[in-house]
């Protein structure tokens, strides 16, 4: 196959959903390329084109409200010469007001545009089963391609600090999630003055109202370099259960696991489908359990080590070097 990817973002979803799988497919005899979304992108001879989040409303030319006619015309024109794959890893129809992209997606014009682009695709690929259950109403030809990691992540030696570190990484859209664990984290810091807390990405430290400073590191522009910033001994993955959050993937817990980090995560999809409670980490069902589970891990180094090793073993089953065949089969199905 000759496959071309068109991505809305270079890192994050762009890395996991477009660049990483296409790079791996290139290692197995397929000709692949990718570039940022724009309505002047051409096929360059590709027989499969994968478009991430095509359509909608934004200030960007590729998806702007004033450009919807151009985008739709461009997308339909590609249909004449290649199999069309619409790639989606979030539900654009259930974006929450706290999300910075709320004004971009939550309007009738954006919804109609996204639906139109999905409807004319030969295949829609999504990252989770829940997302597939929703999008199948728009296009019945759906393939679930769950997020994978590069095998090299399993051998990354994370930085180790003198003080035990509890950590979290995420974007501004997770503000409600941090709120769910803030009390437990604050209580844990008060009881354990000799530990550190480290946030990577959005600066949501103010949500915790911590008794002392929480260390903060801004996002790294390269996904592979971002992995090297993670110095956590314990990872947290809070997630407020909402209609939008239900479609999220397990990638945060998978990243922690690959680095041998036990996780304390909210007992909701997607995390409960990946984290093995009591084996690779803990699943929290009630707010007070955050402090309890963190205390157990802080006080038991042997448990942290065992859970971390179990987590890494689990993560080894989720490498793109094994999982690329799912992308290969999905794309071949529409040729």
Predicted regions: what is each one?
Residues 49, 79-96:
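Active-site proximal beta-strand in glycosyltransferases
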């Amino acid at each position: 196959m000759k496959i071309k990817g068109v991505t809305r973002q270079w890192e994050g979803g762009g890395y996991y959903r477009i660049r990483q799988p296409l790079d791996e497919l290139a290692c197995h005899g397929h000709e692949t390329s990718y570039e940022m979304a724009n309505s002047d992108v051409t096929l360059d001879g590709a027989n499969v084109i994968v478009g991430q989040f095509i359509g909608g409303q934004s200030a960007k030319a590729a998806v702007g409200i004033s450009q919807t006619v151009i985008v739709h015309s461009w997308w339909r024109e590609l249909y004449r010469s290649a199999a069309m794959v619409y790639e989606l890893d979030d539900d654009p129809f259930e974006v929450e007001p706290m999300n910075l992209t709320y004004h971009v997606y939550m309007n009738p014009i954006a919804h109609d545009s996204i639906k139109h682009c999905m409807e004319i695709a030969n295949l829609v690929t999504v990252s989770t089963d829940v997302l597939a259950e929703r999008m199948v109403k728009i296009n019945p030809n759906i393939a679930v391609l769950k997020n994978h990691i590069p095998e090299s992540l399993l051998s990354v030696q994370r930085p180790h600090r003198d003080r035990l570190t509890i950590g979290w990484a995420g974007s501004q859209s997770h503000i409600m999630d941090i709120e769910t664990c803030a009390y437990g984290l604050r209580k844990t810091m008060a009881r354990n003055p000799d530990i550190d807390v480290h946030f990577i990405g959005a600066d949501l430290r103010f949500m915790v109202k911590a008794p002392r400073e929480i260390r903060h590191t801004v996002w790294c522009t390269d996904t592979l370099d971002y992995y090297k910033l993670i110095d956590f001994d314990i990872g947290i993955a809070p997630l407020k259960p909402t209609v939008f959050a239900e479609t999220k993937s397990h990638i945060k817990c998978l990243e922690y696991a690959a680095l041998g980090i036990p996780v304390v995560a909210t007992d909701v999809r997607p995390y409960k489908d990946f984290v093995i409670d009591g084996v690779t980490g803990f699943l929290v069902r009630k707010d007070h359990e955050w402090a309890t589970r963190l205390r157990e891990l802080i006080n038991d180094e042997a448990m942290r080590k065992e859970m971390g090793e179990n987590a890494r073993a689990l993560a080894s089953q989720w490498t793109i070097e094994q999982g690329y065949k799912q992308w290969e089969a999905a794309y071949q199905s529409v040729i």
